[in-house]
Design a protein with these regions (language model features):
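Long, intrinsically disordered, charge-dense linkers/tails
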Residues: 1-186
Length: 186
């Protein structure tokens, strides 16, 4: 629960009810319920951007134009490791975080089943989706920053904050993040 605290609070702020399903066999139960009842679907609070957990007709308008998004994506791809992250540009609430890391529901469920004895998939690679909030002020700042060094620092800091929120920042990467953060507040 503590690892997903920010995601839980964001979902509650949107008016969603959040269930705590933390039993080792819950993945099998969810699969059974979703298979038997076609109108039931479970989503993790950290499985996607909160705007996408429950599909709605209303679309959030992006502050960035399509051309600006097309210009921004390669700038982010140049800094973010492509072997671990798929980058997705989305118009979310401007109060949400600039970068959000999610793991596709299917990949996570397969991994959990493997851990509880399924074992059929071998070792699943860690793949994540990096959702870039095109309505966040910092993302606009990244796009409009003139110097490459500053832009890369903003992207790396935002990525590391997103990784930290998912407990993915460890070892040398964590040490580098802490040192960079100290430099930023000096």
């Amino acid at each position: 629960v503590e690892e997903q605290h920010s995601y839980i609070e964001t979902a509650k702020d949107k008016g969603y009810k959040v269930l705590l399903l933390d039993s080792p066999i819950i993945a099998h139960l969810i699969q059974k319920l979703e298979g038997d009842k076609e109108k039931i679907a479970f989503s993790r609070v950290d499985g996607d951007a909160v705007e996408n957990l429950i599909k709605k007709e209303e679309a959030t308008v992006s502050k960035l134009s399509d051309d600006e998004k097309d210009a921004l994506k390669p700038l982010i791809e140049a800094v973010v490791p492509g072997d671990k992250y798929t980058i997705q540009m989305e118009a979310m609430d401007s109060g949400n975080l600039p970068f959000v890391i999610t793991q596709p529901e299917f990949m996570r469920r397969m991994k959990e089943m493997q851990q509880t004895g399924g074992g059929m998939m071998g070792s699943f690679p860690e793949m994540f989706t990096l959702i870039v909030n095109t309505n966040h002020e910092l993302v606009g700042q990244i796009l409009n920053t003139k110097t490459t060094k500053k832009r890369e620092r903003l992207i790396q800091q935002s990525l590391d904050l997103a990784r930290l929120s998912q407990n993915l920042l460890k070892g040398e990467a964590l040490t580098t993040f802490i040192k960079r953060s100290v430099e930023l507040i000096k």
